[in-house]
């Protein structure tokens, strides 16, 4: 089935008791076992089923199956936020003494999580240059490297990594490539797994949920990576919490997603609630329709901003002058997301003054809403970084970031024109 059909139907058939057409919300903590044997089998991972909603919930299960279908993956795991998803993904593969190789073209919160929080746990994150070439990742990789990390579109640098080349190099080295595909809109604009990525993460808060109403995240497992190569002892060695069970022997290429759920999610507890999952599912039903309008408005505004005398530059991969425009065509089929950045000629103060004049456009720290959003990254999302780190992440003092919504584009232009005056 095609994306537009999957976003409505994947992962759910009317449940037999009420025959509800809409996915029911299951606000329960726990589930009655059929027998002592049934309970024992569930806890021993001899069969799958519901035990406790920190690990699995029927409403959340529909979301996971639907997202996996949209991304072309084999399984998914929903989490309480996008940050929770990436933390869970990395700590499922890496432990103290291990390392991750990452692009520096990251959302500011991710950069801080990598540089500060993971370091405190003994996991080193090694950063490439902003060029994020495969040879840079290879040069930083050793026997303790557990993953390579990129964003499908860097936030807010708006670079597009060469996913095919990175995935090929990673697999030749036996390393899992993980792609934060939040800007890929749930797989509608881009499916990294199809280009060779092993895992995908999402902040479902953004375009998938799409209405600024709920915080949620997810990991999608492509089920296509050979974890047995010797690089992933956390997946191949006997599991002390399950009487020496070897996950790769029991679950094969799904060993990662099983461990993330029954070990990581069980112990760390970053579970998504059923109501939040249902809100994301409701947003997901119109994802393809919203995505088209988001991209159309963004491209229109990017061209318009280029013509404004107060604007020094405009950065959007859909513009012909963008250094990764060819990759936007290859990977995103000419629809590279709904975020653009631009610089004001007056620098830092001009950017803050512009933000203060906005009325229709919301000044807040989010992207992927139905409404258009604006922020000044240097003084907010990336303010915890040094000037050198900001520059490395693609942030400059004069930069404004726009997450373009679904409003009529002429109304957005009128708002921007007034704020620029």
Swiss-Prot record:
InterPro entries in alphabetical order: Cys/Met-Metab_PyrdxlP-dep_enz (IPR000277), OAc-hSer/O-AcSer_sulfhydrylase (IPR006235), PyrdxlP-dep_Trfase (IPR015424), PyrdxlP-dep_Trfase_major (IPR015421), PyrdxlP-dep_Trfase_small (IPR015422)
Any single GO CC term annotated in Swiss-Prot or TrEMBL for this entry: cytoplasm
Signal peptide (residue range): none
Keywords from the UniProt entry: Amino-acid biosynthesis, Methionine biosynthesis, Pyridoxal phosphate, Transferase
Pathway it works in: Amino-acid biosynthesis; L-methionine biosynthesis via de novo pathway; L-homocysteine from O-acetyl-L-homoserine: step 1/1
One protein family per Pfam: Cys_Met_Meta_PP
Coiled-coil zones: none
NCBIfam families xrefs: OAH_OAS_sulfhy
Protein name: O-acetyl-L-homoserine sulfhydrylase 1
Organism expressing this protein natively: Thermus thermophilus (strain ATCC 27634 / DSM 579 / HB8)
């Amino acid at each position: 089935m095609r994306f537009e059909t999957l976003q409505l139907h994947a992962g759910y058939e009317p449940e037999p008791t009420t025959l509800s057409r809409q996915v029911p919300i299951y606000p329960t903590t726990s589930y009655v076992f059929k027998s002592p044997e049934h309970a024992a089998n569930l806890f021993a991972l001899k069969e799958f089923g519901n035990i406790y909603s920190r690990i699995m919930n029927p409403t959340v299960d529909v979301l996971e199956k639907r997202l996996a279908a949209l991304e072309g993956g084999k399984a998914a795991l929903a989490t309480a936020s996008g940050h929770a998803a990436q933390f869970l993904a990395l700590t499922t593969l890496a432990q103290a003494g291990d390392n991750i190789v990452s692009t520096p073209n990251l959302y500011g919160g991710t950069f801080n999580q990598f540089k500060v929080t993971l370091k405190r746990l003994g996991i080193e994150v090694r950063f490439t240059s902003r060029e994020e070439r495969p040879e840079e990742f290879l040069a930083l990789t050793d026997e303790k490297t557990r993953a390579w990390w990129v964003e499908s579109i860097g936030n807010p640098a708006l670079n597009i990594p060469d996913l095919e080349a990175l995935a090929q190099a990673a697999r030749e080295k036996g390393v899992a490539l993980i792609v934060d595909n939040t800007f890929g809109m749930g797989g509608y604009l881009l499916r990294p797994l199809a280009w060779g990525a092993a895992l995908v993460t999402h902040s479902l808060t953004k375009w998938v949920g799409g209405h600024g109403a709920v915080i949620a995240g997810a990991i999608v497992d492509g089920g296509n990576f050979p974890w047995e190569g010797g690089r992933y002892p956390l997946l191949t060695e006997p599991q002390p919490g399950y009487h020496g069970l070897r996950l790769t022997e029991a679950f094969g290429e799904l060993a990662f997603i099983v461990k993330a759920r029954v070990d990581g999610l069980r112990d760390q507890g970053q579970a998504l609630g059923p109501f939040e999952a249902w809100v994301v599912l409701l947003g997901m039903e119109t994802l393809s329709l919203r995505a088209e309008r988001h991209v159309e408005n963004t491209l229109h505004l990017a061209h318009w901003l280029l013509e404004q005398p107060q604007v020094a530059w405009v950065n959007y991969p859909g513009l012909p002058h963008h250094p990764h425009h060819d990759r936007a065509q290859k990977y995103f089929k000419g629809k590279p997301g709904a975020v653009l950045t631009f610089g004001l000629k007056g620098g830092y103060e001009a950017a803050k003054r512009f933000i203060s004049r906005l009325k229709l456009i919301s000044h807040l720290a989010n992207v992927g809403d139905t409404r258009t959003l604006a922020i000044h990254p240097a003084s907010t999302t990336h303010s915890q970084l040094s000037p050198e780190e900001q520059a490395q992440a693609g942030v400059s003092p004069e930069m404004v970031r726009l997450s373009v919504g679904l409003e009529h584009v002429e109304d957005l232009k009128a708002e921007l024109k007034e704020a620029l005056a």
